[in-house]
UniProtKB/Swiss-Prot annotation:
This is Stress-related protein. Plays a role in plant defense. InterPro entries: REF. Belongs to the REF/SRPP family. It comes from Phaseolus vulgaris.
Amino acid sequence: MRCAILYSYAKERAGPLKPGVNTVEDAVKTVVAPVYDRFHLVPVELLKYADRKVGELDRHVPSNVKKVSSQARSVVSEVRRDGVSTFAKTVYSKYEPTAEQCAVSAWRKLNQLPLFPQVANAVLPKAAYCTEKYNEVIVSSAEKGYRVSAYLPLVPTEKIAKVFSGN
């Protein structure tokens, strides 16, 4: 738009060159006009075509895919409305029991493999020791005021022991 304004301003002020500018402009219009007339609606036609194809695709998409899409939209709107931390807490409280059940089930399946129980009995005490040391370091760094410790989670060793000992 600004280029057109600048062009018309320069054309008006062309002085003795104005007839030459008009001749060149007419020659360009003669060459470009048929091409423009033929192709200026192409972007609109492409959009119409794409819209039709999306409509056709929508008819062929299975209903469960549409349902997942609408659920994703509702999740995004919930996150926008309530905030990420509220949403994360809701998801955590909803799926934590399921994750625990899956972990216990996987543990039982692994214990059925040959040699796994012996390897687990050898590794678990060291892993428990390292986990306790990690938790102690995080707690002590938080007490000393290191900000990074606020972002590092504690490993819930008591909860893990309770979940796996109950089975």
